[in-house]
Amino acid sequence: DFDGLNLTWETLEGIAKHNGPLPLDEDGAIQAYSARHDLELDTWPGPEAQVAALADDIAYNNHDVDDGLRAGLFSVDDVSDVPLVGPVFAEVKAAYPDLDEHRLIHEAIRRMIGAVVEDVIVESRGRLADAGCQTGDEIRQLGRPVVSFSETMQAHDTDLKRFLFERMYRHYKVNRMASKARRVVRELFTLLVEEPQCLPGV
């Protein structure tokens, strides 16, 4: 008869520390919850949460490359010097020289996702074999992630994030829209607090 989310310990633990262990000495909602239902905040999460964290990273990076190109914040030529991204675009251009830009971007993004996922699979298999872990608890107690990019792919990921930060996240058009959005939300909040009859159903 429970009406709501019935989250297992593993789900809560994965949400709380999918990016790794959390400091125990900080005051926060997660630490307060963990004091009642120990989430073992000083250990790495189980393998599913580690996969989710990397999948999130892969999705964000590739989505942002796609968005940045389609919004005209940077061009295909601009990404030519970005490791992984540039070579993949060059590979697609060489294979399909007459491809229009929309399809070029789509195919390159698809291949980049494939390359990064393959890297994670190979690296993680090696780490699991080296660690000899058989259970999620053994993985939690290992003291390091087992689901990970290779060292080379981690460097590519860092380079891509740096490029996106400089060319997209700090782009004046993005900052202008973010500023407008903050203003709209602030004004809407003020209106609804001062005039609650504007809320639906009131």
Give the role of each language-model region.
Residues 2-202:
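Histidine-centered, transition-metal-coordinating active-site segments
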